[in-house]
Amino acid sequence: MKVIKTLLVSTLALVSLAACKTVPSYSSDYTQADHKIQGINLTDQQALDIGTRFVAAFNTLGTPAFVKQASNLYADQLFINDTLSQFSQKKDLVQHFQGMNNRVSNVSVKLISATHHQDSAYIHWQMAYDFKMFGRTKTMDSYGISEIKINQANQIIFQQDFWDPANGLYRSLPLIGGAYGWILPFKKSL
């Protein structure tokens, strides 16, 4: 049994390291887009309005209304990185949304706070949803912050999501979650 565990861990580590080598970090893309893309300077009320529209649209995730409502938030040319995917064209983002929409249900998104600095709104949110994968449905819950810049038409031209996929997704996936938790157990000290 120990040999099997060792082989499993070694294989998983090798695959993980290989994936890390072939997938570039998004940090340089974020830095470049953040400097290049200029939104409008925001007020407190505009930041709150951005958060309210964002949460309202994503509360329809998993319903027929979602793709249209979410699509209306975004400009044709944009930078969006949600930690798992990156897009620069609205059409590609909408296609991604269509796929997401087929896998989730019972979505609840709450706006915790909205603040801003110059042209960036920082939207702090909580999202809970049921996620279908491999024929099973799992309830997920995560917190995150989205940095959002908008243009004069109030469309999102820049969005960088900061959230913890380990807690919000990886640990909850069938098969993968168990292996992830075994290799990197959650540590809690009170």
Where is each model-derived feature located?
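A solvent-exposed, acidic/Ser-Thr-rich amphipathic alpha-helical stretch
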Residues: 67-72, 76-118
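A beta-strand edge to alpha-helix "cap/lid" segment located at domain peripheries
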Residues: 21-39, 102-108, 112-190
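Hydrophobic alpha-helical core bundles mediating ligand binding, dimerization, or RNAP-core interactions
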Residues: 51-58, 74, 97, 127, ...
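Short, low-complexity N-terminal intrinsically disordered segments enriched in polar/charged residues
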Residues: 20-68, 72, 190
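Bacterial N-terminal signal peptides that target proteins for export
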Residues: 1-8
